[in-house]
Amino acid sequence: NHNFIRLWRWEVPRHRYGQGALSFCEPHPWARTGPGNARDGKPKFDLTKFNEDYFKRLRQRVEAAAKRGIFVSIMLFEGHCLQFADEGREFHPFHPDNNINGIGWTNWEEYYTLKNPKILQLQEAYVLKVIDTVNDLDNVLYEICNEAGNYSTEWQYHMIRFVKAYEAKKPKQHPVGMTFQYGAQRSGRNEDLFKSPADWISPNPEGGYRDDPPPNDGRQIVP
């Protein structure tokens, strides 16, 4: 009788972990207009034009969950693939070979930081589009990013505040969450979650949070 699901975002059109199968993912939030082809052989992304089919499907799935009494945590960004997939980074829409906008990073970790204003502006535009798509629905929560490492802390704090500030002007306001920052060498700390402006958090098991959590102080929801 579960009443909560995570609606995953997968950021790369093509990826592979180790010797595993090659995986493909679509649609994506941005239109593939070209000119020219991206590294996966399909038209390059225009990061200033949204793929309306992506957002229509997002809303349809949240509405379908609502009819079944299910709350949906919309994952805005996904950090695991860029960290760990042996193939993946080179196919990301923000890799300079895959878009027509001259957007790119000097290091992939930059995508989850505040270091590149052009990337941040496009990320914020995407977040606003998600909010506009589902704001009137009651069964919505937001998760900023799944399993980005500790390099993402200030970026996640910024995004939490950004979502809250925009929704404050909208008809409805929804809980915004921050989940544990996982990384092979760059994991975050539960302390960073508790210090965040998030409404809800998902800590790692340290301190008994897997099976014997301590009393909550009421500042944040710890599901």
Question: Can you say where each PLM-predicted feature lies in the sequence?
Answer:
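Active-site core of glycosidic bond-cleaving carbohydrate-active enzymes
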Residues: 221-223
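Active-site mouth of glycoside hydrolases
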Residues: 1-199, 210, 215-219
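Short, acidic/turn-prone active-site loops that include or flank metal/cofactor-
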Residues: 205-208
